[in-house]
Amino acid sequence: MKQHIGKAYDKVDSKGILTGKPSYTGDFVPKDALVIKVLRSPHAQARIKSIDTSKAKLIPGVEAIFTHEDVPNTRFTLAGQTYPEPSAYDALILDPVVRYVGDEVALVVAKDEATALKAMPLIKVEYEVQKPVLDMHTAIDHETVVHPEDDIHNNIPVGQDYKRNICVSYHKRVGDVEAELAKCDYVVDGTYFDQATRQTAMEPFQSFGYVDALGRVVIVSSTQIVFHVRRHIARALGIPATKVRVLKPRIGGGFGSKQTACTEIMTAFVAWTLKKPCYLLYDRTESQTCSTTRHAREWKIRVGATKDGLIKVIDMDSITDAGAHATHCFTTTTAGEHKSIPLYNKATAIHYGTEGVYMNHTPGGAFRGYGATEALWPLECAVNNLADKMGVDPAELRQKNLIAQGEQSLVYAPDEYLDSGLFQDTINRVKEMARWDERPHSWDIDERYRGGLGMALALQGSGVANIDVASVEIRLGDDGNYTLYTGSSEMGMGSNTVLTQMACEVIGCPMEYMTVVESDTDIVPFDPGSYASSTTYVTGTAAKMAAEELRTKIIAKFAEFFETDVENVEFDGVVATTKDGSKTMDIHQLAPKLLVGVKAEQLSGFATWGSHTSPPPFMASIAEVKVDKQTGKVIPLHFYSCIDCGTVINPKLARVQVEGGVVQAIGMALYEDVRYSNNGRLETNNLMTYKIPTRQDIGELHTDFVESYEPTGGFGAKSIGEVVINTGCPAIQHAIKNAVGADVRTLPMIPEKVFMAMDEKYKV
């Protein structure tokens, strides 16, 4: 019987957040901090010919104004990835070439925001405007080269050809696609488009910085990736990493947006240069425009099957809008391969490819789902179409082709297998939840509305195999309590609670005995940060191992004081006794004794862990919608989800993860769109124009779990944070198609698209 694993604890920081305790970056800004505001480009692509800041500098209270002439000329990447990261080093703190509307032109530093805003219009900039690259289909060999510079650096080749606006070119082929397609009895094909979407975290991007008494620049930021940010700052400023400290308070949401450095390098430059505290806060328009989005991608897909229902060919090719910088472009596009094609493991030939192109849009970056969301959208739609063409139940077709435990996919590494997965059980459970086999999948609700059901499956990963590792230290304090040190980032999902549960389960102590210290590069051991669904699987396993080491040391010390062998000591996490009960001592008595005298020793456990594999969590979903035949408006009624994420460490937090991901998926499917004008200006740059769903827009959410046991993960756990966003778009698309015959293949599926694609017999 587990003491903590599987228990639905509240988040350890929930009371402080609910009662308004200072928690976020903005709560800790020094009162004397200078304010940084950013002058931004009105053009999508231009070269700065001249900048005159003389009048602006005369405004009382203006401390400094910096342009591209004042900053180091060292290129870096903003992507939060373990070195050597594959994202191109194509950014400068300030660049003489601007590449999207909103790109940074100058930094205005003043005593307060009002003064900075007063000075900004007085800066005179002369631009040489170029024709922008705004269409992914014409980006390659466009007359405008988005990155004409010769000093872009790549750590590894990713098929780049910058003079042609190609930042990524990747193709994976196994088997002969054309030959195998010729043998198939059924083939479906199509072109699908998934739009750029915005993470839209509640907390905007912000950071403050200062130079400490040791002459080091300290950055406090809302970031998921403190160690990666430290490395990027050091490179950009040309200083040793030992001169940089990065720490984060609590984050008000990230969803991948804060896996990319945003404000931190500009803040660090100003603080380092002026040797004064400074603060940079993006407003909502800047947060929407000047960070990163999910990559927009257009797909061409072919799926072929034999008459006995075996999917033999999957052919997926795409073009990807990287935006102004190739931030995360290679890894998001290639990640989709590993998290889509393995679903259907009877295939004998596959092709997965993409060209990532530079464009004059907001840079693409990390967003929950990280490539899997994009790739599963066309694949799951195609599988549903294949089932329709074959006249079979789409659930039955999937279950016949699904990868099984112990199998190896065509796209897996030679030593990579599916070690755990109750995928068939997961599908069966979601079918029960939605009564899939007991009712029609399309029906009339009344004269105006029709209802429909739709299905989709999804995989994800758990960390980045063979690359990312996590280190955790747990110390026994002088009072008998414990401190867990981690570089992972709590950003609202409850990771500190889960790590505490895993560590306390090993030690055997109550949850209140453990405090978590996180995300301070001076204090905690290395962790790449909270991304790639890695925290529970990678950091959690390291926490379990560190706790095991510490527990062993504690028992050994009890044995010393009892003058007996360790085998004769029983320790329940608080009290130790000899097996005969003759001697007893609790941890609060032991701890201070360990820190007195010449043989004093503070006990700690330490572990570093990474995995050769990235075990996939699995999700099966059924969407139920009603469609207005007069307008094409889609109204979500129910969304049923069943997830295999291995052992569920905390059911309450896991359920919240599922619900949050599903809500974001509904937003991507029906409402959200990063939309640009003809000259490249972002039109959906605030929360009035960029529509995210509210509680009234999502229907009822139904969630359940099927628990497999992952042998490589701590307590059998896999990830859950990202897979939950991957089924919404194709499941809702399938439900719409079943309801009114509208086969909408571009996201979002807004009423106009649905109505135009609706079967004529349903239109009112």
Question: Where on the chain are the PLM-derived regions?
Answer:
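Flexible, low-hydrophobicity surface segments
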Residues: 1-159, 187, 273
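Short acidic, glycine/serine/threonine-rich loops at helix termini
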Residues: 75-80, 119-122, 230-232, 255-261, ...
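Helix-loop-helix junctions that connect adjacent transmembrane helices in secondary transporters/permeases
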Residues: 146-237, 402-481, 611, 683-697, ...
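C-terminal catalytic domains of large/alpha subunits in multi-subunit enzymes
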Residues: 69, 238-243, 273-279, 307, ...
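Thiamine diphosphate
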Residues: 231, 245, 252-275, 279-280, ...
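Catalytic phosphate/nucleotide-handling subdomain of diverse soluble enzymes
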Residues: 462-524, 538-539
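Glycine-rich loop/linker segments at domain edges
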Residues: 7, 13-19, 83, 88, ...
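Extended active-site and interfacial segments that coordinate phosphate-rich ligands
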Residues: 15-16, 121-128, 132-134, 224, ...
